């Protein structure tokens, strides 16, 4: 489960109004992006992030998320970007068919990059300062 938070005056986390301010694209669109971001976090941390059979919470600062995803985008984009945007993220050179300009980006890579970069933009634009998710593991 995702829980977004924004910093409070006391330095703690409070539930943000992010999900209430995401029109006009609609909540389903952004929920899909957040689910993709969750997959990215699992890609990096996997079972190593959790004690076996116990609920754990992994908290990443926004800068931490940026660090992880920027590295991932660089890895997948390889030489497919020409410059970086104002957040330091690669600007991909995608043709209308959705592939990189040399045809080497497959659909998975394209979707992975698009979802993670859009999720990062979303967090940045909404001033989200941290991302939390909780995973419950059960005995088999």
Curated annotation (Swiss-Prot):
What reactions does this protein catalyze?
a thioglucoside + H2O = a sugar + a thiol
- EC top class, as a word: hydrolase
Q: Which residues constitute the catalytic centre? A: 70 (nucleophile)
Q: How does activity depend on temperature?
A: Optimum temperature is about 40 degrees Celsius.
Q: Mind listing the UniProt keywords for this protein, alphabetically?
A: Glycoprotein, Glycosidase, Hydrolase
Which EC number(s) are documented for this chain? 3.2.1.147
Regulation acting on activity, per entry = Inhibited by ascorbate.
**One MF term from GO for this chain?**
thioglucosidase activity
Q: Cross-referenced InterPro entries, in alphabetical order?
A: Glycoside_hydrolase_SF
Keyword hit for Aminoacyl-tRNA synthetase: no
Subunit-level organization: Homodimer.
General function of this protein = Degradation of glucosinolates (glucose residue linked by a thioglucoside bound to an amino acid derivative) to glucose, sulfate and any of the products: thiocyanates, isothiocyanates, nitriles, epithionitriles or oxazolidine-2-thiones.
- Annotated protein name in UniProt: Myrosinase 2
Source species of the chain? Brevicoryne brassicae (Mealy cabbage aphid)
């Amino acid at each position: 489960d995702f829980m977004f938070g924004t910093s409070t005056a006391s330095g703690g986390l409070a539930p943000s109004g992010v999900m209430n301010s995401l029109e006009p694209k609609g909540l389903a669109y952004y929920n899909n992006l957040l689910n993709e971001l969750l997959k990215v976090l699992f890609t990096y941390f996997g079972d190593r992030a959790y004690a076996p059979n116990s609920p754990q919470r992994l908290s990443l600062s926004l800068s931490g998320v940026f660090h992880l995803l920027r590295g991932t985008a660089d890895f997948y984009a390889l030489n497919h970007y020409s410059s970086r945007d104002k957040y330091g993220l690669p600007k991909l050179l995608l043709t209308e068919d959705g592939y990189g300009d040399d045809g080497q980006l497959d659909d998975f890579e394209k979707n992975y990059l698009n979802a993670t970069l859009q999720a990062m933009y979303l967090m940045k634009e909404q001033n989200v300062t941290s991302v939390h998710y909780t995973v419950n593991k059960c005995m088999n």
